[in-house]
From Swiss-Prot:
Residues 21-195 form the EngB-type G domain. Necessary for normal cell division and for the maintenance of normal septation. It comes from Campylobacter jejuni subsp. jejuni serotype O:6 (strain 81116 / NCTC 11828). The keyword Kinase does not apply. Mg(2+) binds at residues 36, 58. GTP binds at residues 29-36, 56-60, 81-84, 151-154, 174-176. This is Probable GTP-binding protein EngB. Keywords: Cell cycle, Cell division, GTP-binding, Magnesium, Metal-binding, Nucleotide-binding, Septation. The lineage of its organism: Bacteria, Pseudomonadati, Campylobacterota, Epsilonproteobacteria, Campylobacterales.
């Protein structure tokens, strides 16, 4: 279980000198899919990760040190809140720099053990999400895993949830509003960062 968390630093671009002694979990997804809200819910802190009121405005790579506990043993991991992608109102030049920085970061950051790909449960087959999944698979190492997490599941009825789970069998459905699915997600995060993931 996650017992505490604190903000460490923000980066505008990849810095190879900022190494990590801990396993890391990267949160990726479209702008406004709920990355910051999910981090806050997992860490049980309302304002740990700041979500921007303007989708696409948050362009920093934010790091959080998270203390976890498993079988009475405490250990630390890092959560990485990545800029939301695919928002049209970001200028083309900024978008290119942004994508280049993220590309370098994701490929070279060997301490990342889990990529959490957040997808809005009401829009599950957007081209941008399909492209992100394919992109991550191209450089995924044996000690890394991609986990699809469908957000805002409180907007779905039981039948829609069952259909979604049946289509994406290894995914997790979550809701920040009613805390649905957060315990299961927490277990996967801890297992994967400890090297116990399936």
């Amino acid at each position: 279980m996650i017992i505490s968390a604190k903000f460490i630093t923000s980066l505008v671009k990849f810095d190879e000198n900022l190494s990590s002694n801990f396993s890391e979990v990267a949160f990726l997804g479209r702008s406004n899919v709920g990355k910051s809200s999910l981090i806050n819910s997992l860490c049980k802190q309302k304002n740990l990760a700041k979500s921007s009121a303007t989708p696409g405005k948050t362009q920093l790579i934010n790091f959080f040190e998270v203390t976890c506990k498993r079988n009475e043993e405490k250990f630390n991991i890092n959560f990485i809140d990545l800029p939301g992608f695919g928002y049209a109102k970001v200028s083309k030049n900024l978008k290119e720099i942004w994508n280049q920085n993220l590309d370098e970061f994701l490929k070279l950051r060997t301490s990342i053990k889990l990529f959490i790909h957040l997808i809005d449960s009401r829009h599950t087959h957007l081209e941008i999400d399909v492209n992100l999944n394919d992109y991550l698979k191209r450089f995924l190492r044996p000690d890394q895993k991609i986990l699809k997490v469908f957000t805002k599941c409180d907007k779905l009825n039981q039948s829609e949830k069952a259909k979604l789970k049946n289509e994406f069998k290894d995914s997790i459905l979550v809701s920040n509003l009613n805390k649905f699915g957060l315990d299961s997600l927490e277990d996967i995060i801890i297992d994967q960062t400890l090297g116990l993931g399936k």
